[in-house]
Amino acid sequence: MKTTILLVILGLTLLFALSAATELKDEERDCKGFQVKCKKDSECCSSYVCGSQWKWCVYPSPFGR
């Protein structure tokens, strides 16, 4: 009986953690991912920049702009 209650509480905690992680992921969907057309850096997700030549969201150059 005690084990069953403990497993139910553990399951509910796991569901709560997964739903919170899903909500955080939804907030980031407004940004554009890798090789998607962009006009400025703010449109791209945090790990990308808007490339100056082709205007795609790409990884930033290690050598600067």
Curated annotation (Swiss-Prot):
Residues 22-29 form a propeptide. GO terms for cellular component: extracellular region. The keyword Secreted applies. Expressed by the venom gland. Disulfide bonds join 31-45, 38-50, 44-57. Keywords: Disulfide bond, Ion channel impairing toxin, Knottin, Secreted, Signal, Toxin. Pfam families: Toxin_12. It is found in: Secreted. GO terms for molecular function: ion channel inhibitor activity; toxin activity. The keyword Disulfide bond applies. It comes from the Eukaryota. Residues 1-21 form the signal peptide. Belongs to the neurotoxin 10 (Hwtx-1) family. 32 (Jztx-16) subfamily. The presence of a 'disulfide through disulfide knot' structurally defines this protein as a knottin. Probable ion channel inhibitor. This is U11-theraphotoxin-Cg1a. It comes from Chilobrachys guangxiensis. The lineage of its organism: Eukaryota, Metazoa, Ecdysozoa, Arthropoda, Chelicerata.
